[in-house]
Amino acid sequence: MEPFVEPEPQAEPQRVGYVLGLEPATTTEFRVLIDDDNYLQLDDLVVVSTQVPKAGEVRIYGVVTEVASRFEGGRFESDTLRIAEEGTMDADRTRSATVQTMRVVPEIWVAPDPGEVASRVAGKSRDEALYADEMARRLPVGFAKDGQPLWVDVDFFDGTKGAHLSISGVSGVATKTSFALAFLRLLTAHHALTPAGANLRALVFNVKGEDLLWLDKRNARITPEAREQWAILGVPAEPFPSVSFWAPVRQGPELIPDTESRMEGVSAFSWTPLEFIERGLLRFLFTETGDFRAQLTFIEERVRAQLIRNCEPDPRHPGVAIVEGTPIESLGDLVDLIELHVDPPDGEPEFAWTGRVAGGTGQAFMRRLHAAQARIGRLIRPGGRRVDRLAEAVCVVDIHKLSDFAQRFVVGAVLDEVFADKEATGQRHPLQVILLDELNKYAPREGHSPIKDTLIDIAQRGRSLGIILIGA
């Protein structure tokens, strides 16, 4: 792979205007009067050097957050016609930019003096504005509007100084997902996390369409300009070299992935009844915010404990569980067994399974289980195969055809496995990166759920465990 080669930057900053003096400039924001023969646009980086008594030169870096233009000399809106059309009033066109302070070097927080020259950053001043001069391990992740690369400090991603990545942007147009995948491609290609980076594993949940099932194929529509940009970033415009694809098993006796555009190279995933019980996956059937208030989670905890206590593997049939002498070969078998204890057709619910809850709560619990049987029943079967997250560098789990209920179950079950494995080993490396789109759906601000608890654990303890979350 070609090393990252940064384009040759301009040697010196280019003057674009002066700091306005008709209104106060502050330590956090100031305005620039733009020269007639120049321009500033949104997100441009600006530097102002100002002399501070007893401190010397202070460089103030900022980013353009707004650009405005006006006639200077008019007082009323109707003066626009007199100036522009009739020519009966004299006025000058002025353009100004609002700049928000990003960095001050040295860190003496003062406001820029009015009339100081404002320049567009370039070369070393650009590095200083973006803190790139302090990045020991900087990873190129894209380009700014000036055509120069932008970087992130890997130390703040991989757990050295911080962890996790949050991507914000417009929803529904796949821009956040596209950036997240490009980031993963650059991260794995540059091995920026060496020595651990070479063994990094990424888990990607595909929630929209089947586009991500083609990450190992070439882009037939890539342009020469895009190839050149990838080359500048130090990565060839090639697909991910190491990817595994997983999709939910299709309804029926065969282990066939439920996909449409691609079958080759896609594995079907499911869980055995024994895994479902022993790993306590029942709790991921109760992930709605109202379940906690309705005491459904209270019954679920007691039922889960009873199942684990009374469960043993069937020695003759791998994956089949035996609970109280009853073989459990499907989710339907398990629901029937639970119903005998929680909501029997004749008699009272067993205290060990339900505790002291109203009868209606037990009935609501069983209604949820019967609904779950129809939604995820095919995912619980003997001979099932769990997602193998470590087989390749990138693991794509396709859940876009599942209902919201089933998606929450799969995400919860897989994340729980990731967290449990990392806790068991106690080792940060190899790092496990998780890309989860629509993060707010799984961890809403209000309410409680097992998935939210798992994600909070990852956010709080993932840095020390080597689990890095990318949320979009």
Give the ranges of each region predicted by the language model.
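Long, basic/Gly/Ser/Thr-rich N-terminal segments
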Residues: 1-135
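Short amphipathic alpha-helical face segments that pack within enzyme cores
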Residues: 41, 178-183, 409-417
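The Walker A/P-loop phosphate-binding site
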Residues: 133-162, 370-394
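P-loop NTPase motor domains
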Residues: 192-197, 204-205, 209-213, 239-460, ...
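Short helix/loop capping segments that flank catalytic or ligand/cofactor-binding pockets
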Residues: 42, 109, 150-151, 160-162, ...
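Conserved beta-strand position immediately N-terminal to the Walker
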Residues: 165-167, 397, 470
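Glycine-rich phosphate-binding loop of nucleotide-binding enzymes
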Residues: 141-241
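Short hydrophobic alpha-helical runs that function as membrane-insertion/retention elements
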Residues: 202-203, 468-471
